[in-house]
């Protein structure tokens, strides 16, 4: 017989009745019933009920053991009485009548209970993560993560991709966040950087003659934390040679759709076999297969976000023309003050009551806004009520017609420069959808966001800057960079969004040195700066670079959505807290004087004033 087990705690069934077995595991729960002791023994695979009689050797020892002590038992599998069968357990038809027991490890008093999974402060959970990970929900999340990564790998290999590893110790590069620096002992005063992404290396692999690359890549970014962001994370890093944007979409859509369909527990996933029509920012209507597509401009105008939750059916509309000639003086004044200003409407299906409108108005004020203009259908007056409808009178009906409002609806308005209010309008749309229970939470709704602006205005530095990935190919190439207003140039950049979360970003790369240098020049970087920071890749492009592109879905966010969690810490085995601390290993920690000397550095903590 094996030293510790013949079966796992999730393996035994009614067909095993009469068998002599050995199992080992943790005491999940212990109950004393009139002299008999019942134990739910747990391991990675499940639970099995044990029965100990007073005459069982070791009975007295087991009686005093705490929960989470580890034991090994020998015994006979017996059928439970019909009244004691637990249909919720795979092992619920049997129990083990214990004949011998050995304590393998005795547990001290627990700082964090495992059974029952009560809510506990995150600080305690992270400090005792080894106990937290024994809890069923978190344990399943980590197993799910493993299975998702395995599924992704299989799907990538099936499409002809090769998995390569890229360096962890590399050079610093401006990727949009601060680097984690690693001092070099062999080169005093110099530092490595941990990769924010394997961006340059995966492009260099394409220049090196490889074609379809992927890896499950660790990435490190010293940035402010939030529920869906961590200082260290993993991404499915992908790059392909001789591809267009459409080729990249066609390669990754089956992977994303397949993984979500495999692990969605029956929830519908956006199909990829249907045909969609898509109108770009220049008015061209195109047909395509796969996930729905929105341009960045459309996404901001309709949803107030570049990562819209399309489970929410509300689509905002521009209703500026209804207010230009007066009727509601405040909006007319705002529109007349600047040609960029607009009035957006946020329909609220079934929200037609003053109480709901007042509640939304109070919420807006809590968000630091003066309030929300609104109108609603008043059943008492059998007509449209609210200050805006009252001022417009019959002039409100064309707005209702444009928005498709019915006699159960309301509508909210925001006015000003969309660049300023779009984010708040998006929050208001989300709030309306949530309050009115319009969001179908039992589905995974995907879309592509395409045609991102190549550049944006940096108000702090009063200059044009890259809006996203600086290595993207501008639409129109060198001619666009030389002749167009930089703020009108689109890039071949794209994101995948699911249920309001950005799951990945990607781009067709700028593989021509002259276009790359010009793009950086537009953003205020001289050729010498580009050569210094990106010389390795730039020089490689001078020796023949294929057109290439890629993207990088975030593993943590994918698993977070599939596990129905709201924080990625719930799908990471040993995460940092929101202050970037590892409470289990006590990191970050001060280094020893010897280590500072070996690295030729000194620590100068900030002076508190």
Curated annotation (Swiss-Prot):
It catalyses: tRNA(Asx) + L-aspartate + ATP = L-aspartyl-tRNA(Asx) + AMP + diphosphate. The keyword Ligase applies. GO terms for molecular function: aspartate-tRNA ligase activity; aspartate-tRNA(Asn) ligase activity; ATP binding; nucleic acid binding. Pfam families: GAD, tRNA-synt_2, tRNA_anti-codon. It is an enzyme of class 6 (ligase). It is found in: Cytoplasm. Its EC number is 6.1.1.23. The record marks 33 as: Important for tRNA non-discrimination. Its main location: cytoplasm. Residues 199-202 are annotated as: Aspartate. One of its GO terms (cellular component) is cytoplasm. InterPro entries: Aa-tRNA-synt_II (IPR004364), aa-tRNA-synth_II (IPR006195), aa-tRNA-synth_II/BPL/LPL (IPR045864), Asp-tRNA-ligase_1 (IPR004524), Asp-tRNA-ligase_1_N (IPR047089), Asp/Asn-tRNA-synth_IIb (IPR002312), AspRS_core (IPR047090), GAD-like_sf (IPR004115). ATP binds at residues 221-223, 502, 554-557. Keywords: Aminoacyl-tRNA synthetase, ATP-binding, Cytoplasm, Ligase, Nucleotide-binding, Protein biosynthesis. GO terms for biological process: aspartyl-tRNA aminoacylation. L-aspartate binds at residues 175, 221, 468, 509. Homodimer. Belongs to the class-II aminoacyl-tRNA synthetase family. Type 1 subfamily. Aspartyl-tRNA synthetase with relaxed tRNA specificity since it is able to aspartylate not only its cognate tRNA(Asp) but also tRNA(Asn). Reaction proceeds in two steps: L-aspartate is first activated by ATP to form Asp-AMP and then transferred to the acceptor end of tRNA(Asp/Asn). This is Aspartate--tRNA(Asp/Asn) ligase. It comes from Caulobacter sp. (strain K31).
